[in-house]
UniProtKB/Swiss-Prot annotation:
The modification N6-acetyllysine is found at K119, K139. It catalyses: adenosine 5'-phosphoramidate + H2O = AMP + NH4(+). The keyword Zinc does not apply. Belongs to the HINT family. Coiled coil: none annotated. This is Adenosine 5'-monophosphoramidase HINT2. It comes from Homo sapiens (Human). One of its GO terms (molecular function) is nucleotide binding. Transmembrane segments: none annotated. It is found in: Mitochondrion. The gene is HINT2. Keywords: Acetylation, Apoptosis, Hydrolase, Lipid biosynthesis, Lipid metabolism, Mitochondrion, Nucleotide-binding, Steroid biosynthesis, Transit peptide. A motif (Histidine triad motif) lies at residues 147-151.
Amino acid sequence: MAAAVVLAAGLRAARRAVAATGVRGGQVRGAAGVTDGNEVAKAQQATPGGAAPTIFSRILDKSLPADILYEDQQCLVFRDVAPQAPVHFLVIPKKPIPRISQAEEEDQQLLGHLLLVAKQTAKAEGLGDGYRLVINDGKLGAQSVYHLHIHVLGGRQLQWPPG
């Protein structure tokens, strides 16, 4: 119970910090300033798989800092450094699955766990009125980091169609 109180206090502080970033309409300020919307170009240049560590593997091993919202033995949840909505966080498995299209039958429980953690974190972040889950897969899906990740976006009215 004490951990839940600490988590709730941290989430309130994080929401205040996000509100102070000046998010208005389509312009979103992230840790590196205004996003450039160039994810497609990044995806075109990304290397699908390989031995090199990804930015997410560096966050997992704590060699790269991140604003971590949740962690357990199977996954990690952290804020996106270039948010596309007032609330934008990523849910990643600790198991290095490069793409959702490369997930195996044995990953079924893990994939379900990622979705449940996304739901629980969205609730903790105050997204009770709705949010969007996004998984980009491959170059044409604009995947720029080849470590499976679920984007959770909310905090404003999202538009349709998304792409």
